Regions:
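Bacterial Sec-dependent N-terminal signal peptides
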Residues: 1-28
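Hydrophobic alpha-helical segments, especially transmembrane helices
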Residues: 3-5, 103, 112
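Short S/T/G/P-rich N-terminal loop/turn motif that feeds into the first structured element of a domain
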Residues: 18-89, 93, 97-104, 131-135
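Histidine-centered active-site/metal-ligand motif
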Residues: 35, 108-111
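Stable alpha-helical elements in mature extracytoplasmic
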Residues: 49, 53-56, 110, 114, ...
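Structured helix-beta-strand junction loops
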Residues: 63, 121-124
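Short, exposed beta-strand-loop hairpins at the edges of beta-sheets
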Residues: 103-106, 116-118, 122
Length: 135
């Protein structure tokens, strides 16, 4: 009996520790669809407009229950190269579990409200959507 209990305990420990290592070491972005949006603001030096844009985009991100993961950032101070475009002001990334979720997001009230309240603040928006490929 003791050996069966010990065997089960060792098995559970082994299974649990293997799963933990796999999750912690995974480099794969979660989500089937990666929705990347770049924003060029009309007045990136206008602190009032920048604050309003940040307020509205953060509201969108905090009310989006469809995304698996999300990111909001500004251009990094990486080495200037011909292939690097740091001309945008903000980058927002959402990952979605499926194309269906991404399509629902497009018509979701929080997305439409964000566009309505913030569209006057940008001069350009560029969207890149991609699907996950096995690695």
């Amino acid at each position: 009996m003791k050996s069966k209990i010990l065997s089960v305990a060792i098995s559970l420990f082994f299974i649990t520790s293997c799963n933990t290592v796999k999750k912690e070491n995974s480099k794969i972005i979660e989500g089937e669809i990666v929705h990347t949006v770049y924003f060029w603001l009309n007045s990136p030096d206008n602190l009032v407009e920048v604050a309003l844009f940040e307020k509205e985009i953060k509201k969108l991100m905090n009310t989006n229950n469809l995304a698996v993961k999300m990111h909001l950032g500004k251009p990094a101070s990486t080495t200037k190269r011909g292939v690097v475009d740091n001309s945008y002001n903000y980058c927002m990334i959402f990952t979605f579990p499926s194309l269906k979720h991404q399509r629902i997001y497009q018509d979701h009230p929080s997305h439409l409200i964000f566009i309505d309240k913030a569209k006057h603040l940008w001069k350009k928006v560029q969207v890149y959507d991609s699907t996950t490929e096995p690695i």
